[in-house]
Amino acid sequence: MAPSNLPSVFNATSQDIEMLLAAQCHLGSKNLQVHMENYLWKTRADGVNVLNVGKTWEKIVLAARIIAAIDNPADVCVISARPYGQRAVLKFASHTGATAIAGRFTPGSFTNYITRSFKEPRLIVVTDPRTDAQAIKEASYVNIPVIALTDTDSPTEYVDVAIPTNNKGRHAIGCVWWMLAREVLRLRGTIYSRETPWDVMVDLYFYRDPEAEAEEKVEEEKVPGAEEEGPAAIESGFAATGGDWEAPAAGFAGATGTGWDGAAGDEWGAAPATTEWAASAAPAAASGEAAKETTW
């Protein structure tokens, strides 16, 4: 499925195509913009439009060549207001040196020089033309080229390079941003050859739920067997103590000889005999009085 109008060095490998398919980059929406018909492969029976991943790869390479042509990497601004793309743009910026805007785009960042967030980038890359419409609109005012990840229903006004892909799934967004960063580093020479694999895993670009990460951290910090009940708790406690139920404790070693003997026939339920402490103290008191009466 490699495009024929690219030099052979830019052709996608089977692993790249399989990765795009595994991340569901080829699955679009049920709506179709007229400008996205060129990237359509077919429409499924359930109405979902399927994109041509060969053209997706072609546009990834084209976008990477545009980004690599800019001398100062900080002049490239990557933007994502969609939560699934915020982690991806931050990782892309850290690996390529671009400027990232993750979250809400402050209006006037490209047009109002009085604001603190004012920027003058030479190129912007957005995750979704619909959610990042403010950034695209301001870029059109100041003649900034725009690269966008576009779905079948995405508006393409003021978009100069459209990368056809699924821009709603977290795996698809992360996969495309990872491939774009890898191609930029290859063109810059950071990755020496195309046969050399990139040591950064694609999972690093995927969105992660903060609540799920907090729950996983709490689960890791829990004591093993703290929430177990019934036989499982008994077995875990038995294993923790070493499993030796026969060995008596050191404190009870001397008490075994003076313990209750069932053969003696004693009534263990009977009340204990009362100890008359006053009677035992009487002789001592009498001797004390006699000592007082003795005159030396």
Curated annotation (Swiss-Prot):
Keywords from the named record: Cytoplasm, Ribonucleoprotein, Ribosomal protein
Protein localization: Cytoplasm
Name under which the protein is recorded: Small ribosomal subunit protein uS2
PANTHER family: 40S RIBOSOMAL PROTEIN SA
Primary role: Required for the assembly and/or stability of the 40S ribosomal subunit. Required for the processing of the 20S rRNA-precursor to mature 18S rRNA in a late step of the maturation of 40S ribosomal subunits.
Family: Belongs to the universal ribosomal protein uS2 family.
Pfam families: 40S_SA_C, Ribosomal_S2
Biased composition (Low complexity): 263-289
Any GO MF annotation of the entry: structural constituent of ribosome
InterPro entries: Ribosomal_uS2 (IPR001865), Ribosomal_uS2_C (IPR032281), Ribosomal_uS2_CS (IPR018130), Ribosomal_uS2_euk (IPR027498), Ribosomal_uS2_euk/arc (IPR005707), Ribosomal_uS2_flav_dom_sf (IPR023591)
Oligomeric form and interacting partners: Component of the small ribosomal subunit. Mature ribosomes consist of a small (40S) and a large (60S) subunit. The 40S subunit contains about 33 different proteins and 1 molecule of RNA (18S). The 60S subunit contains about 49 different proteins and 3 molecules of RNA (25S, 5.8S and 5S). Interacts with RPS21.
Annotated source species: Fusarium vanettenii (strain ATCC MYA-4622 / CBS 123669 / FGSC 9596 / NRRL 45880 / 77-13-4)
GO biological process: ribosomal small subunit assembly; translation
Any single Gene Ontology cellular-component annotation: cytosolic small ribosomal subunit
Domain of life: Eukaryota
NCBIfam families to which the protein is assigned, alphabetical: uS2_euk_arch
Span list, region Disordered: 245-296
